[in-house]
Amino acid sequence: MVEVTIMLSLTLVLVMGAIDFLLLFYQWNAAAKAVQIGARIAAVSDPVATGLNGLSHAVVSASVPPGAAMPNFVVTCDGRTASCTCNNDRVCRGLKGFDKVAMNTIVFGRGSSSCSDAKSADTVGMCDIFPRITPANVVIVYAQTGLGYADRPGGPMPTISVSLQNLPFQFFFLRGLMGFRDLQIPASTVSTTAQDLASHAPSF
């Protein structure tokens, strides 16, 4: 009987552990796919950093004439703090703050303020792929990497990087059976080039 009890206990731990880790890998994969979707949406949506579209005009000066290469900048928008920071005050003086509506568009999808209510594939947001994602989990970086030019009518053409933060996985079975602690889902970052930083078609 002792042997049977030991074998049953070990089998239970192995089976329950396998279920937990399969769930972990599923959520990891879903989070990575959600980041890909977020980067694609960010490339064709209003920037989370308000005023970013005006930087190509704001940098024009005696030292940066129209048509010159855009000075480098990196703007980081953190959904947890609902703020954007820039590493180049001279270039980023036109930035005004953090646009919650723009962040919600990336997280929830166009025309939505919640998850799992996308009306079509064109309106899917990050949390439609992975419902645990909230704006507080998302970090978006806009970095000037050589494209575009000063005074460009369409604004700058930064490289956009989307990543997740503070997204723990809570073991269900192993937490109770063996005291496993929460595990941070591995970070995933996807970068793409901005195409048209506007959520609406231009009017002529």
Q: What is each stretch, according to the model?
A:
Residues M1-L23:
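N-terminal single-pass transmembrane signal-anchor helix
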Residues E3, M7, N29-I37:
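A broad detector of short, well-ordered amphipathic alpha-helices
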Residues T11-M16, A31-K33, D128-F130, F180:
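Homeobox/homeodomain signature
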Residues A18, L22-F25, R93, L177:
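A general structural-boundary detector
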Residues D20-A32, P47-V48:
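Membrane-proximal amphipathic alpha-helices
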Residues Q36-F204:
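Short, conserved structural patches
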